[in-house]
Amino acid sequence: MPLSRLIIQQFRNIKACDIQLSAGFNFLIGPNGSGKTSVLEAIYLLGHGRSFKSSLTGRVIQNECDELFVHGRFLNSDQFELPIGINKQRDGSTEVKIGGQSGQKLAQLAQVLPLQLIHPEGFDLLTDGPKHRRAFIDWGVFHTEPAFYDAWGRFKRLNKQRNALLKTASSYRELSYWDQEMARLAENISQWRSLYIEQMKTVAETICQTFLPEFEIQLKYYRGWDKDTPYQEILEKNFERDQSLGYTFSGPNKADLRIKVNGTPVEDVLSRGQLKLMVCALRVAQGQHLTAMTGKQCIYLIDDFASELDSQRRKRLADCLKETGAQVFVSSITENQIADMLDDNGKLFHVEHGRIESN
């Protein structure tokens, strides 16, 4: 469902704004520091309950204010509007409303508002540690497997308890009860992740080939422990090692998505522009797979569109996004940088000093 209206209050340098949106492309044009990234950040907050730039609530609430509000309205398939909103206080408390009902959970926001973010720091998906790629996988599994969210949360709680027990246990028998449930959850989580990658990777490899035709892309899922050994057996066999480490070494919390081009890790081959295109391809592939599996459309947030991309690459990305039919929000310093994306269905907003005006 596309956002039809966005209301932001007391968020960073945006005192208040109320804008009507296009179901297609929405362009935010303005100089650095004008507030265009803050609009994307506010939409992200609406879908995730947190900022993508700061984990500290106080930093996104406007100075001398005690709270912020972000509200949105969606048009569903019957063209009825569904309101959603989030209010965050400086003390860290949060209130979520969906359809006018208070007390909703952040996970429900994410279900209603599936978002894909592409921003200048997004290279970490390819160049940093496995946690970024686990988050990438888990975004997809969360939206396609209803049991995943609770199972993953329970596994993390049990893993924390197990790590505490490792410090005091005199024998493995003291952990065996916990390990049975951990193993059951781990096997389920791994199966869901593996299935997701198998289903999504054909789409991802095809789009990557379109963006980077000179390379052959390979995606391979690693589950976090030996693929031929049951997880409970791993836990028992590695008990003494885990004790000496003080934590559980193997498990779904160590899973990774290994990405190579022409058989070599991507970070050793691709330029920054090529890395950005690869990130874009993977994000678009996730959105397309989501639509194929659930009928939901993803909303794309693209910050600093022209960064690292020449005009030819910008056109490739623009054409691919247009083909999805999804709602897209793009920030850019000048209109020239988004010329390939402009059409009659798009909407242009000029942003300056936190004020947002529609053309």
Curated annotation (Swiss-Prot):
Residues that bind ATP: 30-37
GO molecular function, one term: ATP binding
Pfam families: SMC_N
Alphabetized UniProt keyword annotations: ATP-binding, Cytoplasm, DNA damage, DNA repair, DNA replication, DNA-binding, Nucleotide-binding, SOS response
Keyword Transcription regulation (UniProt): no
Compartment list: Cytoplasm
Gene Ontology terms describing biological process: DNA replication; DNA synthesis involved in DNA repair; double-strand break repair; SOS response
GO cellular component: cytoplasm
InterPro entries: DNA-binding_RecF, DNA-binding_RecF_CS, P-loop_NTPase, RecF/RecN/SMC_N, RecF_2
PANTHER family registered for this protein in UniProt: DNA REPLICATION AND REPAIR PROTEIN RECF (PTHR32182:SF0)
Function text: The RecF protein is involved in DNA metabolism; it is required for DNA replication and normal SOS inducibility. RecF binds preferentially to single-stranded, linear DNA. It also seems to bind ATP.
Protein name (Swiss-Prot/TrEMBL): DNA replication and repair protein RecF
Native species: Vibrio parahaemolyticus serotype O3:K6 (strain RIMD 2210633)
Upper classification of the organism: Bacteria, Pseudomonadati, Pseudomonadota, Gammaproteobacteria, Vibrionales
